[in-house]
Amino acid sequence: GVERLDRVDHEFVNVHVGDRTIPALLAAVPEATAVTLSWRLFGNDGVVDYVDEPLTETFTRAAPHVLHWPWRALLFKTLVRNDGSYGKLGVHRPRAPDEARLAGQRWVDGSGRVLPAAFHRGRIFLDPGRDSHALVQLNHYPLGAVQSFVLKRDRGRAVHAEGGLDAGYWVERNFIDEEDRSILALDSRVLRDGLRGDRVLGPLHQAAVDWRHRRFRTLMQEDAWRSFYGQLRMAGPTRVLSQAEAESIWKPYIRG
């Protein structure tokens, strides 16, 4: 189980220091007990059809490193030392902190900056207007191809029952302002070929690919799903808001 692991994380970790491995990242911040791996959102970039190719190769345009809105673009996952300071793993961060151990916590962001004590207990997103990707970023592909997003909505969200996978979700994540191919230097072809050639995993993977194509064709028999598909096809890239524009959304209305 995870209890035996030193550190725990998942997703597309993209390290920018040393030999681009997790040990190289930890060597760059040796005193850190936790590193927040800030998302970099990769948008749809006009890809319509689902194809069985790696996300990292298909989607290479992303949000700028500095964003002021939406706050969901500032979410992070956590690479945390598994030393008993927290009793549970959460979706974005460890939970159930041991109060007696918190004084020894040292959290840093993906640029190596020390984060305030509020992060030791409950924060799940970073402050806006800062580049938190100098050492490491988490490549996040929330949309995929248009057909894939239709299937994602059909499936539903794995963690959050509230908040639909609707056009609003799409708009908040469809950033394609900068090209970023940095993760492609970490060649995964040998590993992928090995998995696809596995006598158990290979057929299961192909069955999943075939199912996705069949399911999409089935959904397109219904007017509501065709309408949603059409909405996504008409939607353009998301516009990045300036700091002033972002602050005008919340600053006049939130006190304190």
Question: For each predicted feature, which ranges?
Answer:
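Short beta-strand-to-loop acidic/aromatic patch adjacent to the donor-nucleotide binding site
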Residues: 1-14
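Catalytic-site signature of metal-activated, phosphate-bearing donor transferases
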Residues: 15-241
